[in-house]
UniProtKB/Swiss-Prot annotation:
NCBIfam families: nadA, PRK09375.1-1, PRK09375.1-2. Coiled coil: none annotated. The keyword Cell division does not apply. Pathway: Cofactor biosynthesis; NAD(+) biosynthesis; quinolinate from iminoaspartate: step 1/1. Its main location: cytoplasm. Catalyzes the condensation of iminoaspartate with dihydroxyacetone phosphate to form quinolinate. It catalyses: iminosuccinate + dihydroxyacetone phosphate = quinolinate + phosphate + 2 H2O + H(+). This is Quinolinate synthase. GO terms for molecular function: 4 iron, 4 sulfur cluster binding; metal ion binding; quinolinate synthetase A activity. Binds 1 [4Fe-4S] cluster per subunit. Its cofactor is [4Fe-4S] cluster. It comes from Pectobacterium carotovorum subsp. carotovorum (strain PC1).
Length: 353
């Protein structure tokens, strides 16, 4: 069973686009960032959806480019005393929850996520209280307060496996906040899932009819889709998965052309994984009134070179993540469950190899 919680659709105001930098300015900030990372004993942790030059800098300086699960793992095991998280705010909060002794800096604390914004803790807590017989599973794209209200935190890379596990134990589920991913895992597992009505502003814009027209132009291309996309788009896919799973699919699929329905920031690592293949952006209807994000998260785009340099140099209120101690303790429980479950999955996969 899958029921959608009926909340009002919200149009979120987007941040202004970062000012473009000259080649000389970019080189200045890259050099400054490298120096500041050394001086602060810091390491960069960047998400796949940040701009290519940010991902390249993270790699060049010994940092990490990954999905949110691997970002969490990397930050927990690295020896640096400071983590510079290039992503959105919930990623910085997660890093602080898992590493309270470390300084967590972000280029800006105003980098939001529509899934986080669409799941306010007071409203969500009331919803959970109305269904006390259900296990509460929340996506990593949520605030520390929402995580603290949950029994489990999950990323898209292990969502199906976790819901299968809970279903095998006879659990009924509350899933939040992404309605498309919740619907996808329900269909994959047959579990009893009650979905909160949230959506990613990037993936929600992929259009079935436009994708069909693109497939006519590229009939031999494979279609890769993130499960935060609408069901009708997911049903057209040759491969469905998280960011890391889509990169792996790009490597292993035989097709030489790939239509990719996720944030175009992923193209940097995906092209590294299969340089011989042609990557094509799935249509969102193009620039203009019919698309707002146009396949790139506007908050991820806030993680520019200038902002990163400022974050490392200035720190303080505008850049440092703090999480209340009691809230951290509450959120750490479901986060550790996620990490332990993910580790057990890896062991099981190795055991079956």
């Amino acid at each position: 069973m899958s029921i959608l919680f009926d909340s009002n659709e919200t149009i979120y105001p987007f941040p202004p686009k970062p000012r473009p930098l000259s080649a000389e300015a970019k080189q200045h900030y890259r050099s400054r960032i490298k120096t500041l990372l050394r001086e602060r004993n810091a390491v960069m942790v960047a998400h796949y959806y940040t701009d290519p030059e940010i991902q390249a800098l993270a790699e060049e300086t010994g940092g990490c480019v990954a999905d949110s699960l691997e970002m969490a793992r990397f930050g927990s095991t690295h020896s640096a005393s400071t983590l510079l998280v290039a992503g959105v705010r919930f990623m910085g909060e997660t890093a602080k929850i898992l590493n309270p002794e470390k300084t967590i800096l972000m280029p800006t604390l105003e980098a939001e996520c529509s899934l986080d914004l669409g799941c306010p803790v007071d409203e969500f807590s009331r919803f959970c209280d109305e269904h006390p017989d259900r296990m509460v599973v929340v996506y990593a794209n949520t605030s520390a307060a929402v995580k603290a209200r949950a029994d489990w935190v999950v990323t898209s890379s292990i969502a199906v496996e976790l819901i299968e596990h809970l279903d095998s134990l006879g659990e009924k589920i509350i899933w939040a906040p992404d309605r498309h991913l919740g619907s996808y895992v329900q269909k994959q597992t047959g579990a009893d899932v009650l979905c909160w009505q949230g959506a990613c502003i990037v993936h929600d814009e992929f259009k079935t009819q436009a994708l069909k027209r693109m497939k006519i132009l590229y009939p031999d291309a494979a279609i890769l889709v993130h499960p935060e996309s609408p069901q009708s788009v997911v049903e057209m896919a040759d491969a469905v998965g998280s960011t890391s799973q889509l990169i792996q699919a790009a490597k292993t699929l035989p097709q030489r052309e790939l239509i990719v329905a996720t944030d175009r920031g992923i193209f940097y690592k995906m092209q590294q994984a299969c340089p011989e293949k042609t990557l094509l952006e799935a249509p969102t209807a193009g620039e203009g009134a019919t698309c707002r994000s146009c396949a790139h998260c506007p908050w991820m785009a806030m993680n520019g070179l200038e902002a990163i340099a400022n974050g490392l140099e200035q720190g303080g209120r505008a850049h440092e993540i703090h999480v209340d101690a009691a809230l951290r303790e509450g959120a750490l429980i479901p986060l550790n469950r996620m990490l332990d479950f993910a580790a057990s999955l890896k062991l099981r996969v190795k055991g079956n190899a």
